[in-house]
Amino acid sequence: MLTVAIAKGRLLKSFITYLKQANEQELVDALEKRERQLLISVGSIQIVLVKGSDVPIYVEQGVADVGIVGSDILEEGNYTINNLVDLPFGDCHFALAAKPETSSFNKIATSYVKTARAYFEAQGIDVELVKLSGSIELACLVEMVDGIVDIVQTGTTLKSNGLVEKDTIKPINAKLITNKQSYFKKSSEIDAFLSTLEVSLIDHR
C-alpha cells in the first residue's frame, strides 16, 4: 500500500482534472464521490487529504510515503524530504497586488512571509510584513496595508475585490515529494504511481 498525501482545495481540483485527462477514472470517481472522507483507498493506493501546509509534515513524519503539494508550501518551510519532480498541473503564481492607484508600498499583508521578504529585499524596498492566514484581500480593502503578496491563478478574486496585479513574483506548480525512507523502500510503488500520472523518475534517481 502506497500512502499519498494531497493538498485539499485548489491543488486537489487541478489533480482531479489532470486524472480525467489521463483517463484514470477509478481515482477520479473515488475523489469526486468522497463527500467528507479524508482517507480514501483505491486499489493499492491510500489517499490522505490534508491542508496544503500539512502535506510535507505528513510525508516527513512517515505517515504518507509521497505527497502532492504546491511549490509555494515547500518554499516557505524547511522539511527533511525528497523533492522529486515537477508535476504537470497546479500552475499559478505569486503576485504583488493592490488597488489600481497604489504606486508605493510600505506595508504588505501575506501568508507567505519568506517569499514576500525575498521579493522586496531583491527590489531594495524596505517594507513591513503583516502575516495573515486568510482573506488577504480584505487587508488591502480596509487600508490596513498598501498591498498584498498572494497566490493568483485566474485573477478573478483580485478583480472582484477591485485589486490589480502590480507584479508577477514567481511561478508555482505542483511537486511530488517523498519520505526519505519510502523513497528507497517503496521505489517500485512510487514508480507505479508516477506511471499513473504519466511522469517518469528516470532522471531523478
Curated annotation (Swiss-Prot):
GO terms for cellular component: cytoplasm. Its main location: cytoplasm. It catalyses: 1-(5-phospho-beta-D-ribosyl)-ATP + diphosphate = 5-phospho-alpha-D-ribose 1-diphosphate + ATP. One of its GO terms (molecular function) is ATP binding. Keywords: Amino-acid biosynthesis, ATP-binding, Cytoplasm, Glycosyltransferase, Histidine biosynthesis, Nucleotide-binding, Transferase. It comes from the Bacteria. CDD domains: PBP2_HisGs (cd13595). Lacks the C-terminal regulatory region which is replaced by HisZ. PANTHER family: ATP PHOSPHORIBOSYLTRANSFERASE (PTHR21403:SF8), ATP PHOSPHORIBOSYLTRANSFERASE ATP-PRTASE (PTHR21403). Belongs to the ATP phosphoribosyltransferase family. Short subfamily. Catalyzes the condensation of ATP and 5-phosphoribose 1-diphosphate to form N'-(5'-phosphoribosyl)-ATP (PR-ATP). Has a crucial role in the pathway because the rate of histidine biosynthesis seems to be controlled primarily by regulation of HisG enzymatic activity. Heteromultimer composed of HisG and HisZ subunits. This is ATP phosphoribosyltransferase. The lineage of its organism: Bacteria, Bacillati, Bacillota, Bacilli, Bacillales.
